[in-house]
Swiss-Prot record:
Organism placement in taxonomy: Bacteria, Pseudomonadati, Pseudomonadota, Betaproteobacteria, Burkholderiales
Gene Ontology MF: a single term: glutamine-tRNA ligase activity
Residue sites binding ATP per the record: E52, P53, N54, H58, I59, G60, H61, A62, K63, S64, T257, R292, L293
Subunit structure as annotated in this protein's UniProt entry: Monomer.
Organism for this UniProt entry: Cupriavidus taiwanensis (strain DSM 17343 / BCRC 17206 / CCUG 44338 / CIP 107171 / LMG 19424 / R1) (Ralstonia taiwanensis (strain LMG 19424))
Catalytic reactions on record: tRNA(Gln) + L-glutamine + ATP = L-glutaminyl-tRNA(Gln) + AMP + diphosphate
Principal subcellular localisation of the protein: cytoplasm
Protein name as it appears in the record: Glutamine--tRNA ligase
Family as reported in the entry's similarity comment: Belongs to the class-I aminoacyl-tRNA synthetase family.
EC number: 6.1.1.18
Classification via InterPro entries: aa-tRNA-synth_I_CS, Gln-tRNA-synth, Gln/Glu-tRNA_Ligase, Gln_tRNA_ligase_bac, Glu/Gln-tRNA-synth, Glu/Gln-tRNA-synth_Ib_cat-dom, Glu/Gln-tRNA-synth_Ib_codon-bd, Glu_tRNA_lig_a-bdl
UniProt cross-references to Pfam families, sorted A to Z: tRNA-synt_1c, tRNA-synt_1c_C, tRNA-synt_1c_C2
'HIGH' region, short sequence motif: residues: 51-61
Amino acid sequence: MSHDNKPTDSNPAASNFLRSIIDQDLAAGTYAGRQDKQGEPLPTVITRFPPEPNGYLHIGHAKSICLNFGLARDYGGRCHLRFDDTNPVKEDTEYVESIIDAVHWLGFSWDSEGKDGQKQPHLYYASDYFDQLYAFAETLIERGAAYVDSQSAEQIAASRGNFSEPGKPSPFRDRSVEENLQLFRDMRAGKYADGEHVLRAKIDMAAPNIVMRDPVLYRIRHAHHHRTGDKWCIYPMYDFTHCISDALENITHSLCTLEFENNRPLYDWVLEHLRDSGVFRDPLPHQYEFARLNLTYAITSKRKLKQLVDEQRVDGWDDPRMPTLVGVRRRGYTPESIQLFCDRVGVAKADSWIDMSTLEGSVRDDLDGRAARGVAVLDPLKLIIDNYPEGQSEECSAPVHPKKPELGKRVFPLSRELWIEREDFNETPPKGYFRLFPGNKVRLKYGYVIECTGVDKDADGNVIAVHASYLPDTKSGTPGADSVKVKGVIHWVSAAHAYEAEVRLYDRLFNDPNPDAGGKNFLDALNPDSKQVITAYLEPGLREAQPEDRFQFERHGYFVADRSDSTPGKPVFNRIVGLKDSWGK
């Protein structure tokens, strides 16, 4: 099983530009001396992770989770988990539950300790603020900063202009405050159909930043909400909800990926108008952008991932080939390895592509120190030791972990008939081949030195069994074991005692490092050999593996007992990653 220990080269406090910003704010006392509604002092650093519950989180979200929760931890602050649940058509409690589970699995908590020593949860939903958001929208209308537009979505898009042409003002832009208020209230009352009206901010239709050309703040959507039911038929847009939620929760540093950089002026515009109306007061939260995580040989588009699931090109959202967090967890990745990966990737201001080998290297480095060892024969060939007594067996032993003697030894039997890897025998070996061939001696790892004496073949000339004799005084760990020198060492399991297991060999899901770049059809890049299911023979103790126990199968790589399909006494194993980097091949 796995043995917990943090990866030694993890550096959660690595310097980045966001830490520099926070350090400057702390030095200037920007957020010092604040209090919550109960008069309790607020931390000087409060971040948040605000996913929309419309899908499963993927490896790209892990970077944001580690960043937001990690900064809050390192600066003695807190991080909120907030669900941006403003689009009832796409959201579901299934996704809410999966996100909560994923953040917990990564090792983070949104609880803080109250003055009475009790944990204070900081789990929020944008829908918690629907009443306040509506009231704040009316405030903007009363200030002449928002209006109800009766154009269609197509007309609004057509009149927005482009980078070289200014937008055209809506013919409804100059409605009176009274008319706008009445229309907005009628929208809430359900008097209009979807798309009949929207509420827009009144900013500048000639703004160089197209985001600022009277963006939509509210739209009509007659849809059942997973938390508020049918109470609302109008819903706020992300840009309106996001900044207000931050302010209501006393967020200090609102961290977003780079695609939201052009939205930052709107973030500030909404909060400044509400501050000037007396709703909020300084210091307001501030938005900062960082580069998103782009991983080679993967896609993270929710729409495209859903297509893979819907078309049954993968075995669900938790398929071990998927980049979803439920997928990489089932693959056998550890939370610590993902945190290590995020630390190694770092935080930058410009988008870049991260090679898959960086992720797999982090997994490999983490598991090397924690995974118990075991022996597995994946492509079996029978080996018969002719001079070993029939019906007899003896114990061999090996360390549970070669660098952790305190974990003790594992014991497994050796008998007359063994399984070895087919690639460890070659009847006509090439130069430099030191494993088993007729007349050659090798060591059975943890066992005896043997000499190959012959082979059995089927009618087609295929080798179906190898014969050998063993040298009795050469057993590993006994006096004189090294009296016979050999160059080759092979692994094995006793045929009579081995655990016959289903093993799934996973590889990259795509053959193309950028499967959906440049207008490609990402489906064309699917790797037809990304999953192979085999029957393997394992040392008998592995039969007791529990779901999510991780092992290094010696000479093969790292494997995990599948968390979904394993049953007591019958674990199914997934290959997590090989022993060496395979991405440069």
